Amino acid sequence: TEIGDSEPSGNVPSFTELPNHPLLVQVGSQNVMEQMRPDLAEKGVIFTDFASAMEEIPEVVEAYFGKAVSYKEDRLAASNVASFNSGAVLYIPDNVEIDVPVEAKFYQDSESDLPFNKHILIIAGRNSKLDYLERLESIGDGNVKVTGNLSIEVIALEGAQVKFAAIDRLGEHV
């Protein structure tokens, strides 16, 4: 997806000056941007919202969803599975190395009462390699209190190397 000449609206930050690295941006439960280098897409790398992943690679999602964080583990995990309203799936096929960071930006709108319940599923195929950076941030001037329940599953198959970093800057009302 490419950015056009449209202006950002409301609390959505501008993304027109972004480098060409794999990137997914969500505000609330909506995708506002997906960016994938053509060479990585040709190798089968997928980075998209959960609903789209269920359409594109349902067998992969079904095989690994809940394997690292089972809903049977505790009430918080069960609540996440029952109530997540958005999220993402990153799939890297076997033997694919990504030489630039993969980045996810998840924005919680502080003026919205939509719960911030996300499920992130990262599947790194055999002998794949990637660096993943996740940013969670509240935006806006509101002070609406909402719940937040995030579950992040990283499935690293044999020989896979995954470096994971997260920066959380959620507001005090989440």
Language model: regions and residue ranges:
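Glycine-rich and polybasic anion-binding loops at the starts of cofactor/ligand-binding domains
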Residues: T1-V174
